[in-house]
Amino acid sequence: MKEQIFDIIETISGTDEFREDLDMDLFEEGILDSMRAIMLIVELEGAFDISLPPSEMDREDWNTANKIAARVQEKTDEN
């Protein structure tokens, strides 16, 4: 599952730079911005049949690839 999530992040961001450091702040490094974050949410919801309401997500909860993977795993476990 993690690899699929990382592939989606790579597709949305257009870079695999984050794979070198999965705890890299994706927003600070310019890998994600608000528009790409929304695109990422839409892709993750479709790929994993989960709901990720933006109102439930603080930027600090979604700023690294590891945190994104953990949140998606959490949501899939709820289903």
Curated annotation (Swiss-Prot):
This protein's UniProt keywords: Cell wall biogenesis/degradation, Cytoplasm, Phosphopantetheine, Phosphoprotein
Modification after translation: 4'-phosphopantetheine is transferred from CoA to a specific serine of apo-DCP.
Domain Carrier: 1-76
Molecular functions (GO terms): D-alanyl carrier activity
Biological processes annotated in GO: cell wall organization; lipoteichoic acid biosynthetic process
Localization per record: Cytoplasm
Pathway assignment: Cell wall biogenesis; lipoteichoic acid biosynthesis
Entry GO terms, CC: cytoplasm
Pfam families named in the record: PP-binding (PF00550)
O-(pantetheine 4'-phosphoryl)serine modifications at: 34
Family: Belongs to the DltC family.
Function text: Carrier protein involved in the D-alanylation of lipoteichoic acid (LTA). The loading of thioester-linked D-alanine onto DltC is catalyzed by D-alanine--D-alanyl carrier protein ligase DltA. The DltC-carried D-alanyl group is further transferred to cell membrane phosphatidylglycerol (PG) by forming an ester bond, probably catalyzed by DltD. D-alanylation of LTA plays an important role in modulating the properties of the cell wall in Gram-positive bacteria, influencing the net charge of the cell wall.
HAMAP family named among the record's database cross-references: DltC
NCBIfam families, per database record: dltC, PRK05087.1
Protein name stated in the entry: D-alanyl carrier protein
Organism field: Lactococcus lactis subsp. cremoris (strain MG1363)
Gene giving rise to this polypeptide: dltC
